[in-house]
């Protein structure tokens, strides 16, 4: 029986429930309901299977994973299995009692999202009041417990000018790393693309801000930087290559090669209730479909970067070129490349429409101010 090397990491999307409503959320448009979430036994089994395969890292995400009362149990189980555990959180749910439980369970790292350094801007983007002050308190609680902290800052036209402030905030809050990542336009991000797309000038300014900070700060702060695909000439290796290093588990227990894979019609996604993780990883239809290079069109087959970018993003190829098996339109060899560049420039130059907030109860567009939750 043929096998492939195991994934390096597994992302556990424990829930799609979340206090925030960010318009660029990587969750699918069709959010899983509470009643659809896999139970504790299912997640424990998943961790056991991952460890047996040789997976090294377990990333607990959502939605907001701290809304799951069994999160400390799952973190403890990961620790007992020898898996490195990382929490990806909004920092506005759970509070210090939950953080104490997670530390006791063996949690090893925290990634905290930050929408903006401006309080009003942060609330507008998150669709949640007083978000920045709550995140500040959460970051302080994380550092007080000696846990390593990374800030995740998603960049777009509404906050691009404040990238220097976000880097300064990471230092102020005691983070060891910040990821400055331009919005990736899948799912909710694609739906809100016209509201989020930065201009080329804004992108250039963020590049300067990051490079300047890297030179001045040295080893004080690690800065990861992700540019927006729409202004690129070469595709990035999505998730390190389709079904190469990463596996995503949805709240329902579906096993996915990436966050947005369910947007590709015609692929069969297996569920942990029906097949083992190893069987799905090694032999599942969805994983085999775009793994490696055999699937690539002729122009990709002859490219010297074919085993570097692995053909780019399949979900983006479908969304922008209409075919998941064709060139990623980010690639300058794609016939669709000039069109997506023109789309980005046109949308960035136009007035930003209201956000369509990530809300399961109201998937249609809503006015920005009307959608902000009153959580006080």
From Swiss-Prot:
PROSITE patterns per UniProt: RADICAL_SAM (PS51918)
Keyword annotations of the record: 4Fe-4S, Iron, Iron-sulfur, Metal-binding, Oxidoreductase, PQQ biosynthesis, S-adenosyl-L-methionine
Domain Radical SAM core: 4-219
Quaternary structure annotation from Swiss-Prot or TrEMBL: Interacts with PqqD. The interaction is necessary for activity of PqqE.
Cofactor: binding comment: Binds 1 [4Fe-4S] cluster. The cluster is coordinated with 3 cysteines and an exchangeable S-adenosyl-L-methionine.
InterPro entries per record: 4Fe4S-binding_SPASM_dom, Aldolase_TIM, PQQ_synth_PqqE_bac, PqqE-like, Radical_SAM_PqqE_MftC-like, rSAM
EC number: 1.21.98.4
GO biological process: pyrroloquinoline quinone biosynthetic process
Protein name (Swiss-Prot/TrEMBL): PqqA peptide cyclase
Enzyme kind, highest EC tier: oxidoreductase
Top-level lineage group: Bacteria
Binding site for [4Fe-4S] cluster: 18, 22, 25
Family from the record: Belongs to the radical SAM superfamily. PqqE family.
Co-factor(s): [4Fe-4S] cluster
Function: Catalyzes the cross-linking of a glutamate residue and a tyrosine residue in the PqqA protein as part of the biosynthesis of pyrroloquinoline quinone (PQQ).
UniProt GO molecular function: 4 iron, 4 sulfur cluster binding; cyclase activity; iron ion binding; oxidoreductase activity; S-adenosyl-L-methionine binding
Name of the gene this protein is made from: pqqE
NCBIfam families linked to this entry: PQQ_syn_pqqE, rSAM_more_4Fe4S
Catalysed reactions, as listed in the record: [PQQ precursor protein] + S-adenosyl-L-methionine = E-Y cross-linked-[PQQ precursor protein] + 5'-deoxyadenosine + L-methionine + H(+)
Pathway this chain belongs to: Cofactor biosynthesis; pyrroloquinoline quinone biosynthesis
